Amino acid sequence: MELWPGAGTLLLLLFLLLLLLLPTLWFCSPSAKYFFKMAFYNGWILFLAVLAIPVCAVRGRNVENMKILRLMLLHIKYLYGIRVEVRGAHHFPPSQPYVVVSNHQSSLDLLGMMEVLPGRCVPIAKRELLWAGSAGLACWLAGVIFIDRKRTGDAISVMSEVAQTLLTQDVRVWVFPEGTRNHNGSMLPFKRGAFHLAVQAQVPIVPIVMSSYQDFYCKKERRFTSGRCQVRVLPPVPTEGLKPDDVPALADRVRHSMLTVFREISTDGRGGGDYLKKPGGVGEAGL
């Protein structure tokens, strides 16, 4: 007579215990709910990328494949109860290349980006994303431009090539000039690569501001609920006649206008507002 259950029975009991535990954690632990939601968010994107790859592969690496990725990702906001409001979309130049610069708060920026992404527009992303499984391959097929931020020389070379691509292939690029995600509810100093790119190509800069997520999402507090995000497209900033020496002032001017709008459209649903008052400025030259 066996005193202990077999391995199969033990695994079944553990599985049943997990099924009972998950709903308890979901309703009783905001932190657990946060991790579940983020795990599903990332996992769902990887799954959608698997579905997109065969469709995108028909064209090969092509900026038009970004339309396929956008179509497949637009529904995610509904799964999380996030309402995305777009204002100022008429500011996009109708028939010329340009550089989009946007603030960068978290991976949820993808929702706002897909909502407002103009035609023939691709992001510039860090090279590490290229190795992110199915998502990396789907991004490559969609024409996403990858740069190695640790190798400044290579990044500058890529930017020079991008400037030529903008003009010869009628492409727009989307850049996060903060260079990394910013969770403090303000804006980090801007790196100047996007502005050098726009000046080199003599194309306009289109600033896009996404309101703070603090009322429904906070990584530090492990909080992720439903909420509203406003995406504001600002009037294009011309660069005709500007030279490399004008880049610092240009970056400072664009950041100031974006920060002003960010403070205007952002609200703290829990009654605070101090997170919008943190100082910052334009960073040293770099990418």
UniProtKB/Swiss-Prot annotation:
Its EC number is 2.3.1.51. The chain crosses the membrane at residues 38-58, 128-148. Residues 59-127 are cytoplasmic. It catalyses: a 1-acyl-sn-glycero-3-phosphate + an acyl-CoA = a 1,2-diacyl-sn-glycero-3-phosphate + CoA; 1-(9Z-octadecenoyl)-sn-glycero-3-phosphate + (9Z)-octadecenoyl-CoA = 1,2-di-(9Z-octadecenoyl)-sn-glycero-3-phosphate + CoA; 1-(9Z-octadecenoyl)-sn-glycero-3-phosphate + hexadecanoyl-CoA = 1-(9Z)-octadecenoyl-2-hexadecanoyl-sn-glycero-3-phosphate + CoA; heptadecanoyl-CoA + 1-(9Z-octadecenoyl)-sn-glycero-3-phosphate = 1-(9Z)-octadecenoyl-2-heptadecanoyl-sn-glycero-3-phosphate + CoA. It is found in: Endoplasmic reticulum membrane. It is a multi-pass membrane protein. A motif (HXXXXD motif) lies at residues 104-109. Keywords: Acyltransferase, Endoplasmic reticulum, Lipid biosynthesis, Lipid metabolism, Membrane, Phospholipid biosynthesis, Phospholipid metabolism, Signal, Transferase, Transmembrane, Transmembrane helix. GO terms for cellular component: endoplasmic reticulum; endoplasmic reticulum membrane. Residues 1-26 form the signal peptide. Pathway: Phospholipid metabolism; CDP-diacylglycerol biosynthesis; CDP-diacylglycerol from sn-glycerol 3-phosphate: step 2/3. It is an enzyme of class 2 (transferase). One of its GO terms (biological process) is CDP-diacylglycerol biosynthetic process. Converts 1-acyl-sn-glycerol-3-phosphate (lysophosphatidic acid or LPA) into 1,2-diacyl-sn-glycerol-3-phosphate (phosphatidic acid or PA) by incorporating an acyl moiety at the sn-2 position of the glycerol backbone. This is 1-acyl-sn-glycerol-3-phosphate acyltransferase alpha. It comes from Bos taurus.
